[in-house]
């Protein structure tokens, strides 16, 4: 009896020492509600469907199932930070906020917590400098890249020169919308075009005055930098 008891205790200790297979926790900071839901819903659905497919088709990754930690932000920066704090303790592997404002706020937090951020083509452009921002990855491009590509396309349309042209930027009046301004200002000085800045405040339902200004300015090109506005 004594031997059986000792054996049972030993078996129990071994079972405790061997960790159970843990889920791979991937937070999904979604916005299915609010003025930007038309963009947020298909994105959240797509990410969810893809990760569920990986679980169903491949049995997860390396034999470990993916656990989706969805948290609704409403595209609100404060709520986004709250979602980060609520999910990071679940063993979060990576964050992809799909919001420049939220990304800005999470960079110092995630860096301190040693959790990577993948802000694919959005977020803080300067985070592309990995020597300074060790935990942020914004490949394959940045807002500055996008602004440069847009201007290059306009130049191609104008036989290689924008000298004397007027370009209006109708942009979302937020961290996201302001990202290309510096690049466009530099390119304006370089290529000789006039840059007209026309902000549209959140959530973008009222734009009449903006387009009246566009009519008044009579730009050669109008670039829309919005997120559903």
For each predicted feature, which ranges?
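Beta-alpha junction/loop-to-helix N-cap segments that form part of ligand/metal-binding clefts
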Residues: 25, 38-45, 57-129, 139, ...
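Signal peptide-proximal N-terminal region
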Residues: 45-68, 159-162, 189-192
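Short beta-strand segments enriched in small/hydrophobic residues
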Residues: 23-43, 98, 166-172
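Sec-dependent signal peptide recognition
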Residues: 2-9
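Extracellular/periplasmic Venus flytrap/periplasmic-binding protein
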Residues: 125-126, 134-229
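N-terminal signal peptide c-region/cleavage motif recognized by signal peptidases
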Residues: 17-19
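Short, internal active-site loops enriched in acidic
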Residues: 33, 70-76, 173-176
